[in-house]
Amino acid sequence: MIPKEQKGPVMAAMGDLTEPVPTLDLGKKLSVPQDLMMEELSLRNNRGSLLFQKRQRRVQKFTFELAASQRAMLAGSARRKVTGTAESGTVANANGPEGPNYRSELHIFPASPGASLGGPEGAHPAAAPAGCVPSPSALAPGYAEPLKGVPPEKFNHTAISKGYRCPWQEFVSYRDYQSDGRSHTPSPNDYRNFNKTPVPFGGPLVGGTFPRPGTPFIPEPLSGLELLRLRPSFNRVAQGWVRNLPESEEL
């Protein structure tokens, strides 16, 4: 659990989060099951409720510690900017009455002026001036500049073909494979195909074995409308007394 002395300043800093949040009235159908669920999760004799409470405590502890550590880091960075002292990477948490509760330090050693590539004196420069700028050779000696004295690698001249040659080309060019690629297997004379294709409206069967009975053709009797349609029409287009003259450019 979080001590009361540590929780107090954090809750004071996070006062806006502790204010009552306006809740939406979801009605009786939704609010009653939610209240029952929270009541079941607050029980002590249920394994699921115990796991839920343990998780809530863990989340609360993480939230308080995260807020406290962020405030401490901001305060420490502001203090270093004002005073001008650079203690390398020191983070202190001063929320409790006893002072700092925990401390994490990271020391970066700057490179010495006489450090060489991979030399023993440049590997761990313990004593360095305070005003020296840290360099990468302090963390990884030997990688501060490109390696010297190493001959450049020769270019690997690999024969790369200009085109692609299919491995089946020699078989395709053979005289037996110069056809169009279709199967020319001769089918026997008495071969019957039993694969039936669905043909609508009683189409012809592919594998029919017995002849269909012949149906005599009976012409459909003509109806009265058909007889009227076949009657000759004596309607003529009305023509005037003057014969049609072709149009000319003079008109």
UniProtKB/Swiss-Prot annotation:
Give the organism, scientific name: Homo sapiens (Human)
Region feature Binding to ACTN2, mapped onto this chain = 186-207
Tell me the InterPro entries matching this sequence. Answer: MYOZ
Give the residue ranges for region: Binding to FLNC.
67-110
The record's Pfam families line, in alphabetical order, gives: Calsarcin
Q: Name the family the entry cites.
A: Belongs to the myozenin family.
The chain residues annotated with the modification Phosphoserine are 31
List locations, semicolon-separated.
Cytoplasm, Myofibril, Sarcomere, Z line
- Name of this chain's protein: Myozenin-3
Q: Where is this region: Binding to ACTN2, PPP3CA and TCAP?
A: 50-67
